[in-house]
Amino acid sequence: MDRKDVSITSFDGLRLHGRYYEYKKGAPTEILFHGYRGNAERDLCGGVHRCFEIGHNALIVDQRGAGASEGHVITFGAKESRDCLAWVDFVIKNIAKDARIILTGISMGAATVMMAASCPLPENVIGVLADCGYTSTKAIIKKVIRDMKLPAGPIYPLVRLGALLFGRFDPDKESPLTSMKKCTLPVIFFHGDTDDFVPCYMSEENYAACAAEKKRLVIIRGAGHGLCFPVDPDTYFEELRRFFP
Protein backbone atom coordinates (compact mmCIF):
# COMPACT_ATOMS: atom_id res chain seq x y z
CA MET A 1 0.00 0.00 0.00
CA ASP A 2 1.69 3.20 -1.20
CA ARG A 3 1.65 6.29 0.97
CA LYS A 4 2.65 9.90 0.52
CA ASP A 5 3.86 11.96 3.47
CA VAL A 6 2.30 15.42 3.45
CA SER A 7 2.26 18.45 5.72
CA ILE A 8 0.50 21.74 6.32
CA THR A 9 1.12 24.79 8.50
CA SER A 10 -1.55 25.50 11.09
CA PHE A 11 -3.12 28.91 11.74
CA ASP A 12 -0.69 29.37 14.65
CA GLY A 13 2.45 28.28 12.80
CA LEU A 14 2.76 24.58 13.64
CA ARG A 15 3.88 22.04 11.08
CA LEU A 16 1.27 19.29 10.99
CA HIS A 17 2.01 15.92 9.40
CA GLY A 18 -0.19 13.48 7.54
CA ARG A 19 -0.06 10.42 5.31
CA TYR A 20 -2.14 10.12 2.15
CA TYR A 21 -3.21 6.74 0.76
CA GLU A 22 -4.93 6.78 -2.63
CA TYR A 23 -7.45 4.08 -3.41
CA LYS A 24 -8.23 5.56 -6.79
CA LYS A 25 -8.60 8.96 -8.38
CA GLY A 26 -12.11 10.34 -8.09
CA ALA A 27 -13.00 8.28 -5.02
CA PRO A 28 -14.23 10.08 -1.89
CA THR A 29 -11.44 11.08 0.47
CA GLU A 30 -11.73 10.56 4.20
CA ILE A 31 -9.64 12.76 6.48
CA LEU A 32 -9.13 10.73 9.65
CA PHE A 33 -8.36 12.17 13.10
CA HIS A 34 -7.14 10.11 16.06
CA GLY A 35 -7.96 10.53 19.73
CA TYR A 36 -6.26 11.96 22.80
CA ARG A 37 -2.54 11.13 23.02
CA GLY A 38 -2.83 8.91 19.98
CA ASN A 39 -1.08 9.15 16.63
CA ALA A 40 -1.96 8.38 13.04
CA GLU A 41 0.41 5.48 12.46
CA ARG A 42 -0.67 3.57 15.56
CA ASP A 43 -4.37 4.39 15.72
CA LEU A 44 -5.53 4.91 12.14
CA CYS A 45 -3.86 2.21 10.03
CA GLY A 46 -6.96 0.05 10.50
CA GLY A 47 -8.96 3.01 9.27
CA VAL A 48 -6.92 3.06 6.06
CA HIS A 49 -7.76 -0.59 5.38
CA ARG A 50 -11.41 0.13 6.16
CA CYS A 51 -11.36 3.07 3.72
CA PHE A 52 -9.88 0.91 0.96
CA GLU A 53 -12.43 -1.83 1.62
CA ILE A 54 -15.26 0.64 1.14
CA GLY A 55 -13.59 2.38 -1.81
CA HIS A 56 -12.32 5.61 -0.25
CA ASN A 57 -8.99 7.41 -0.32
CA ALA A 58 -7.55 8.06 3.15
CA LEU A 59 -5.63 10.97 4.63
CA ILE A 60 -4.60 10.14 8.20
CA VAL A 61 -3.22 13.03 10.20
CA ASP A 62 -1.15 13.44 13.33
CA GLN A 63 -3.03 15.94 15.45
CA ARG A 64 -1.08 18.83 16.97
CA GLY A 65 1.23 17.61 19.72
CA ALA A 66 1.15 14.03 18.43
CA GLY A 67 3.19 11.79 16.16
CA ALA A 68 5.29 13.74 13.67
CA SER A 69 3.31 16.97 14.12
CA GLU A 70 4.58 19.94 16.07
CA GLY A 71 2.99 21.35 19.21
CA HIS A 72 2.97 20.61 22.91
CA VAL A 73 -0.60 21.35 23.99
CA ILE A 74 -3.67 19.22 23.28
CA THR A 75 -6.86 21.32 23.23
CA PHE A 76 -9.55 18.61 22.99
CA GLY A 77 -10.77 19.84 19.61
CA ALA A 78 -10.67 23.60 20.21
CA LYS A 79 -7.67 24.31 17.97
CA GLU A 80 -7.70 20.87 16.32
CA SER A 81 -11.01 21.74 14.65
CA ARG A 82 -9.31 24.69 12.96
CA ASP A 83 -6.55 22.34 11.86
CA CYS A 84 -9.27 20.18 10.33
CA LEU A 85 -10.37 23.09 8.15
CA ALA A 86 -6.78 23.50 6.97
CA TRP A 87 -6.59 19.81 6.02
CA VAL A 88 -9.79 20.19 4.00
CA ASP A 89 -8.19 23.09 2.15
CA PHE A 90 -5.08 20.97 1.57
CA VAL A 91 -7.08 18.16 -0.05
CA ILE A 92 -8.89 20.54 -2.39
CA LYS A 93 -5.71 22.36 -3.43
CA ASN A 94 -3.32 19.40 -3.63
CA ILE A 95 -5.35 16.26 -4.33
CA ALA A 96 -8.43 17.27 -6.30
CA LYS A 97 -10.32 20.54 -6.51
CA ASP A 98 -13.55 18.57 -6.90
CA ALA A 99 -12.73 16.09 -4.11
CA ARG A 100 -15.62 14.68 -2.10
CA ILE A 101 -14.47 14.80 1.51
CA ILE A 102 -15.67 12.96 4.61
CA LEU A 103 -14.43 14.13 8.01
CA THR A 104 -13.80 11.09 10.22
CA GLY A 105 -12.77 11.04 13.86
CA ILE A 106 -12.47 8.69 16.81
CA SER A 107 -12.88 9.91 20.42
CA MET A 108 -11.17 13.33 20.58
CA GLY A 109 -10.90 13.06 16.80
CA ALA A 110 -14.70 12.79 16.69
CA ALA A 111 -14.93 15.94 18.82
CA THR A 112 -12.54 17.60 16.36
CA VAL A 113 -14.66 16.85 13.30
CA MET A 114 -17.95 17.65 15.05
CA MET A 115 -16.67 21.08 16.05
CA ALA A 116 -15.31 21.65 12.54
CA ALA A 117 -18.68 20.68 11.07
CA SER A 118 -20.33 23.81 12.49
CA CYS A 119 -17.80 26.07 10.73
CA PRO A 120 -18.15 27.37 7.17
CA LEU A 121 -16.98 24.54 4.93
CA PRO A 122 -16.72 24.14 1.15
CA GLU A 123 -19.32 22.05 -0.66
CA ASN A 124 -16.61 19.42 -1.14
CA VAL A 125 -17.30 18.21 2.42
CA ILE A 126 -20.15 15.73 2.06
CA GLY A 127 -20.43 14.41 5.59
CA VAL A 128 -19.03 13.49 8.98
CA LEU A 129 -18.27 10.19 10.71
CA ALA A 130 -18.08 10.65 14.50
CA ASP A 131 -17.03 7.51 16.38
CA CYS A 132 -17.33 7.56 20.21
CA GLY A 133 -17.16 11.33 20.57
CA TYR A 134 -17.89 13.22 23.77
CA THR A 135 -20.42 16.00 24.34
CA SER A 136 -18.09 18.64 25.76
CA THR A 137 -14.53 19.12 26.92
CA LYS A 138 -15.75 20.01 30.39
CA ALA A 139 -17.91 16.89 30.66
CA ILE A 140 -15.17 14.45 29.62
CA ILE A 141 -12.52 16.07 31.84
CA LYS A 142 -14.84 15.89 34.86
CA LYS A 143 -15.65 12.28 34.02
CA VAL A 144 -11.96 11.36 33.91
CA ILE A 145 -11.33 13.13 37.23
CA ARG A 146 -14.13 11.13 38.85
CA ASP A 147 -12.80 7.91 37.32
CA MET A 148 -9.56 8.64 39.17
CA LYS A 149 -11.56 8.72 42.42
CA LEU A 150 -10.87 12.42 42.82
CA PRO A 151 -13.34 15.24 43.53
CA ALA A 152 -14.19 17.00 40.27
CA GLY A 153 -15.60 20.06 42.05
CA PRO A 154 -12.32 21.50 43.37
CA ILE A 155 -9.99 19.95 40.76
CA TYR A 156 -11.74 20.93 37.52
CA PRO A 157 -11.29 24.71 38.07
CA LEU A 158 -7.54 24.11 38.36
CA VAL A 159 -7.54 22.11 35.13
CA ARG A 160 -9.51 24.87 33.43
CA LEU A 161 -7.07 27.50 34.69
CA GLY A 162 -4.17 25.50 33.26
CA ALA A 163 -5.95 25.26 29.91
CA LEU A 164 -6.56 29.02 29.87
CA LEU A 165 -2.98 29.88 30.83
CA PHE A 166 -0.99 27.32 28.88
CA GLY A 167 -3.32 26.19 26.12
CA ARG A 168 -5.09 29.46 25.42
CA PHE A 169 -8.49 27.75 25.27
CA ASP A 170 -11.47 27.49 27.59
CA PRO A 171 -12.80 23.97 28.28
CA ASP A 172 -16.11 25.50 29.38
CA LYS A 173 -16.71 26.83 25.88
CA GLU A 174 -15.60 23.87 23.75
CA SER A 175 -18.59 21.67 23.03
CA PRO A 176 -19.24 19.24 20.17
CA LEU A 177 -22.86 19.12 21.33
CA THR A 178 -23.24 22.87 20.81
CA SER A 179 -21.57 22.54 17.41
CA MET A 180 -24.03 19.82 16.43
CA LYS A 181 -26.90 22.23 17.01
CA LYS A 182 -25.49 24.30 14.14
CA CYS A 183 -24.47 21.41 11.87
CA THR A 184 -26.36 20.82 8.63
CA LEU A 185 -23.92 18.30 7.13
CA PRO A 186 -24.91 14.61 7.12
CA VAL A 187 -23.48 12.95 10.25
CA ILE A 188 -23.25 9.28 11.14
CA PHE A 189 -22.47 8.51 14.78
CA PHE A 190 -21.00 5.23 16.03
CA HIS A 191 -20.62 4.22 19.67
CA GLY A 192 -20.07 1.01 21.60
CA ASP A 193 -22.59 0.23 24.31
CA THR A 194 -19.84 -0.99 26.67
CA ASP A 195 -17.62 2.08 26.28
CA ASP A 196 -16.48 2.89 29.81
CA PHE A 197 -14.32 5.88 28.86
CA VAL A 198 -16.65 8.04 26.76
CA PRO A 199 -20.14 6.86 27.76
CA CYS A 200 -22.51 5.86 24.98
CA TYR A 201 -25.10 8.40 26.11
CA MET A 202 -22.79 11.17 24.91
CA SER A 203 -23.22 10.11 21.26
CA GLU A 204 -26.95 9.78 21.89
CA GLU A 205 -27.01 13.40 23.09
CA ASN A 206 -24.87 14.59 20.16
CA TYR A 207 -27.18 12.79 17.76
CA ALA A 208 -30.28 14.32 19.35
CA ALA A 209 -28.73 17.80 19.15
CA CYS A 210 -27.60 17.46 15.53
CA ALA A 211 -29.53 19.82 13.25
CA ALA A 212 -28.76 17.89 10.05
CA GLU A 213 -31.68 16.45 8.10
CA LYS A 214 -29.61 13.35 7.35
CA LYS A 215 -28.17 11.77 10.46
CA ARG A 216 -27.85 8.30 11.94
CA LEU A 217 -26.79 6.80 15.26
CA VAL A 218 -25.37 3.25 15.27
CA ILE A 219 -24.84 1.50 18.61
CA ILE A 220 -22.46 -1.46 18.39
CA ARG A 221 -23.24 -4.10 20.99
CA GLY A 222 -20.31 -5.29 23.07
CA ALA A 223 -17.88 -2.65 21.79
CA GLY A 224 -15.64 -0.72 24.15
CA HIS A 225 -14.00 2.63 23.53
CA GLY A 226 -12.87 3.06 19.93
CA LEU A 227 -13.62 -0.58 19.11
CA CYS A 228 -16.84 -0.37 17.10
CA PHE A 229 -15.19 -1.36 13.82
CA PRO A 230 -13.03 -4.22 15.18
CA VAL A 231 -15.98 -5.69 17.11
CA ASP A 232 -18.53 -5.57 14.27
CA PRO A 233 -16.94 -4.68 10.92
CA ASP A 234 -19.88 -6.06 8.93
CA THR A 235 -22.35 -3.65 10.53
CA TYR A 236 -19.85 -0.80 10.24
CA PHE A 237 -19.40 -1.40 6.51
CA GLU A 238 -23.12 -1.84 5.90
CA GLU A 239 -24.02 1.37 7.71
CA LEU A 240 -21.32 3.41 5.96
CA ARG A 241 -22.24 2.13 2.50
CA ARG A 242 -25.86 3.00 3.14
CA PHE A 243 -25.07 6.44 4.54
CA PHE A 244 -22.43 7.40 1.95
CA PRO A 245 -23.59 5.57 -1.22
Please give the residue ranges for each predicted region.
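N-terminal cap/lid segment of alpha/beta-hydrolase-fold proteins
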Residues: 1-25
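Hydrolase active-site cap/lid region
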Residues: 115-170, 178-179
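Short beta-strand/loop motif that positions the catalytic acidic residue
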Residues: 182-184, 189-191, 195
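Alpha/beta-hydrolase active-site loop
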Residues: 74-95
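Conserved alpha/beta-hydrolase
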Residues: 51-70
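Conserved alpha/beta-hydrolase "acid-adjacent" motif
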Residues: 196-202
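Catalytic histidine-centered segment of alpha/beta-hydrolase-like enzymes
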Residues: 223-233, 237
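The serine-hydrolase catalytic nucleophile loop
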Residues: 36-50, 63
